[in-house]
Amino acid sequence: MKFGCRETGDHEKEDLGMAILINEEKKLFTLNTKNTTYQMKVIDYGYLAHLYYGKKMDGDMSYVITHYDRGFSGNPYEAQEHREFSLDNIPLEYSCYGNGDFRTPAFNIKDIEGIHGCDLRYVSYEVMDSKYSLKGLPAAYTNDGEKGETLKIVLQDPQVGVEVDLLYGIIEDKDLITRSAIVRNISDADIFVAKASSVSLDFVTGDYDLIHFHGRHAMERMYEREAINHGVKKIGSTRGTSSHQHSPFVVIAGKDANEDAGDCYGISFLYSGSFNCEVEKDQTDQVRLNMGVQDEMFEYVLYPESEFVAPEVVMVY
């Protein structure tokens, strides 16, 4: 189902506020706020790739995805001899454990036999003319006179029997884009969620700094800025609260960014419990950020037809 949309040329559909643009022929999704653009696309074999997030832009940013034969980066079975197509090198919207992407995953599940992994592919989308809410969880909302919208993209692995709704909320005038994920068991057996990040954000270039805020009791929010180097950097809390020791908020900043100018991406987790944020720079200098509920010792049982709702993340550029 699609709500509040009208067809335009080149099979493009746009909502009445121009916040959500969908080109069905290219399978291209573009989210616009007053000053920013976020874009993703369904690519070969049904994978949902991340193309762009930053200052407002026009057009198709698919050119950012380049395919090379990287040694020891495997490819999906469907690709056969086309070794240049590897999930290990493609910027993705919601990465999975166990499908050939060896970077830090956003999502990991275990079946009743103890086998980890899944392979999420695109199924459908839905556009709603209001900002989504999350039952029992805090979320950004619109005030009187403000317009909010939602894009829901459904991914599925029918073999494992899991479905994931990726929720994108847009509050256009405030330049806010929010993210959440709803994991649903569509199988006849129990499934165990080992990790379900609220957001996964890939950057095709890696020349960034990480800004975060450490501390202790009575001395919270101490500023720290460091280069994002190769490997994985993790911050978070296992204390049952977001804690004095680390704030569930980070900034990915360009090397030359300061208080007056430069590229900065603020990511805030709207949750007061244990959390995890991980930033990885990979073998090809791409950067990935995942943020969500702390996955250390985490195992959430999903009975058939039940679901897990990941708390919301708010993003600004």
Roles of regions detected by a PLM:
Residues K2-G17:
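Short, Lys/Arg-enriched N-terminal segments with co-localized hydrophobic residues
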Residues V314-Y317:
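Short, charged beta-turn/beta-strand-edge "cap" motif at the junction between a beta-strand
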Residues I22-T30, K34, Y38, L48-E280, ...:
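Polysaccharide-binding surfaces and accessory modules of carbohydrate-active proteins
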Residues K41:
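Contiguous, structured surface segment used for ligand recognition
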